Amino acid sequence: MRLDWFLPALRSNRPGNRRRYPGRIRALGIRMLPRFLFSDHDRMRRGWARRMLVWLGPVWAAAPVRRVIQSCCLITFLVLFFWVCWPYSAQPAAPSSGWIPAEFDYDRATVRLLAESADGAAVAEIGKTSTVFVTDVSSQRTYGERSGNVAGADASDGESAIRVAAAGEGTLSLDLSALSTDQIDELSVSAGPWDLSSTGPGSWPRHYATNLEQREQMEAEFFLIIDPLVSLSTAVASRDLVWSLTAAAGILAVCLLIPRGFCGYLCPLGTTIDLFDWAVGRRLQRFRVAADGWWVHIRFYLLLGVMIAACCGVLLSGYVSAIPVITRGLLFTVAPVQNGVANGWHQVPEWNSGHVVSVLLFMGVLGLGLLRPRFWCKYVCPSGAVFSVANLFRLSERKVDSSCIHCNKCVEICPFDAIKPDFTTRTADCTLCQSCGGVCPTHSIHFTGRLDFVELKTPNDPPTHETALGRRGFFSAAVGTGSALAGGVLSALAINGGTSQAAQNLPVRPPGSVPESSFLQMCIRCGECFKACPSDVLQPMGFEQGLNALWTPQVVADWAGCASSCNGCGQVCPTGAIRALPLEEKRYARMGLAVLNLDTCLPLAGREACQLCVDECTAAGYNALEFVQTGTEIDALGNPVPGSGFLSPFLLPELCVGCGLCQTRCYGINVAERKVLDRSAIVIEAGEGREDRMFNGSYRELAGHRMDR
């Protein structure tokens, strides 16, 4: 089994010189591509392709396949993070008006429409839908609701019964066969104009959910679910088989064939570190440290500490795993710039202590490259340590044959210090990046099956001065292991202690969150839910609830409310800490309960009329606030004085889901703009009896039982 995909060093065709080119592939390339792209081995002249790779850098020239895969993975990661999880372009579906029925085929129940006065953009948009609702402007009747549907009821959230059969430039053909005979008769005699809409009258808005669904051709959390430490530690901490374990098992299986392939090819943090080392690290070498030192095994001790803490029910992997580190780092550094430039800087939430700590951690990970290139990946990353342990079961490996001339080029180019001084391999560190194979002048390096026979070079030549584990090494390993064990246990005790003290004032969590103790054991603090939230109502916590809640999402209703058409946070959560709810379930998921302050609410306190919260709740479709008359004065005869008192808000707790839109409106107008209040008079509070936190089951059914009581 051969796994060579590096570009071999240019070598002449003299007798005795072995060539490593795959003859058939090269011959096919020569026949299909211009000859000047290929090197001339007889004259030892580089082709244009090799010249371009050399210009890009020595690693590009040695292992172009690896660099291409790295680039593609980084670009994919950035697209998923900055485009797929970018909800601000979603808009409610606008109806398209001005359609005139041109041809009506009664037998086939089809009609062809002409867009005589319809807006061009709306015409193009309506042509992309599969079903439409038709409103006859003259009679103001809407057609398309399926049998039994009632406008405004849950059933109207579905598709229309009228199907778009064909769409052309300015024309539409509609299939009306699912309508009743009476409805077809009414439409057949209508002269128009008709209004077309993809949503029915009174249907629940879903533009944010639809936008994410359309963009998510690949799961937005893909790179998070293939980080094995994330899944393993979450499963251990929560004592549950999280669904992302299957993806982790898949990537570990692939890495049996390509040892540590995740680190060498796929990891976007590693590629970002490569870019930092190229742009900054190579210019500042005053801080360089030796390749050997106490730090070379930090990643194993860190992995042990993370797993010990997970066994104690505390999740630490979110703080140090590779993919959560980069997603959170980009979330707090680049994402605010994206939001500010696109939507205005007033739309960027303020920072707290959690933001500062995360940015410092991310910059520290990059800054370690000043000590040695890819210092984090080689010595610190616990996600990489998982793959190093898996290397014990590798099916392939790097081998060096007896033609090695000890030129040291492979040692110089290796990004992971995986080559010993005798040019053999440190198998726990090798990522099969194959850069060494591309610079070997004698083509002595092979990437083959572990059991494949190769005439290997003599080991310990030149001497490596590496010996079996002695007393000093044993003592160092014992100290490191003991420190990892103690650190994991003490971290768990400290974090659990802080959590119990902070349990009195629970934060409001996203809709669909599992019970709080399990939520803290499953949330990896990756920040994907913040990025997918269209109104930034979800914001990271600082240290107000202790270290265990650091960077976990909380609802900040003073800033914004939870959009009724969005379910993005659950869709992008990689571990199930937030359940992936369909919009029909999410609209009933209670994340808190609105509480009115009787002393500060303007009408309840008898100060002035105000209906902001009621209007906002009604517009959102929850109808959990209604008016009651308060403060009415009584004359001497016991009759109410006309014009006295106020219409005040009254909460229907069985309908409130804690979306926070009422609090946002009150804060924005009465606190921020008019400054008649110090804080919102209606706030969302979590806690027992105020929120629904379930691992499974229907929120819709639970809401039905609550309303029946």
Residue positions per predicted region:
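Non-ligating segments of multi-cofactor redox enzymes
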Residues: 2-144, 148-152, 157, 163-165, ...
